[in-house]
C-alpha cells in the first residue's frame, strides 16, 4: 500500500505547503497578541479552515470527474448533507441555553409551535452516532442515485443535468419549514462541540488541525485508489466504457464505488465546515456552488488530485480578495476564468507548471550539449 503513494512527490509537496501554512497560522494566533505585527486573528484561522474544507471537497470531485469522467453538477449536495448532520448535532448541544430555554426542541421548532422532535433527529445529539451519519447520509443518497443512474446507463450531459436537478430539489425541500431543518435560516447559534466552546481560539485551532488532517487522509486514500488496479479500471472506464464492459467488467459497480466514496469525502468536508463558519443553510445546496466547485478543479488541473487542492485554495482566496473590491463583477470573472481555462489551459495551473519545467529542462539539455558539438567541430 505504501508503494502506491511513495512516488507522489508533487502531491505531498502540496500537502507539505498546506501544513506549513497551518503551522504559521497557529503560531501567529497563539504566540502573539492583537496589535503585534505577526499576530494572526481568529478570522484568518477560520478562513483558512474553510479553504481546506473546500480543498477536500474539490479532491472528492476530482476523483469522480477527473478519473471516472462523471461531471457531477450536484456534488455540493453531499457537502451540504454532511454539514446539516453536524449542524443537527451542534443544535442538540445547546440544551436550555437557547432563546426559549427548551432542552428538547431547537429554538426554531419552538418558534414554529412544534411539540415533539422529528424522528430523524433522534440520536443525532450523540457524537459517535452523528459521526456515522455524517458519512452514512451522503453515502446512502449517492448509492441510491448512482445505482439507478448507472444501472440505466445514463451518462454524459444527461447525467450532469440530473445531478444538478438533484441538488436543486434538495434545496427546495430544505427551504421549507415543514421539513424540520430550520427553513431559510438553517441551523446556527451553536454553543459548543464535545463540551468545548465553539468560539474559543483553542477550539478553532483544533478544528483547523482536524481539517488539515482530514484533507491529508482523504488525499492519501484517493491516491491509493487511483494508483491501484481499481484505479486503472476506473480510468479505463473514463476513456472507453464500452471496451471495459466488453471485456467483462461490471462497469456500474466501479462507478458506484467511486461515486459513493466521493460523496463520503464531501460529507466529511461539510461536517468540518459547519463548526468553523457557525451556520448551515439551504444555500449550500445551490447549484451555483456545484458549478463553482467544478471551476476549482478545472483551474487546478483535472485528474491530479493535488491540482484540486491548489485550485480550491487559489480560487477561494481570489474570491475573498476580489469580492471586497468588485462584489458585483466577481461571478462574471469566475465564469470567464472557467472559459479561458477550458480553452487555453485544459490541464489547469499544474499543466502550466509542467510546461515551464519541461522548457527549462530542454534548455538545460541544450546548454549541456553545446560544448560537445563545438569540440567535435574543432576536431573535424
Give the residues covered by each predicted segment.
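Transmembrane alpha-helices and adjacent helix-loop boundaries
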Residues: 1-380
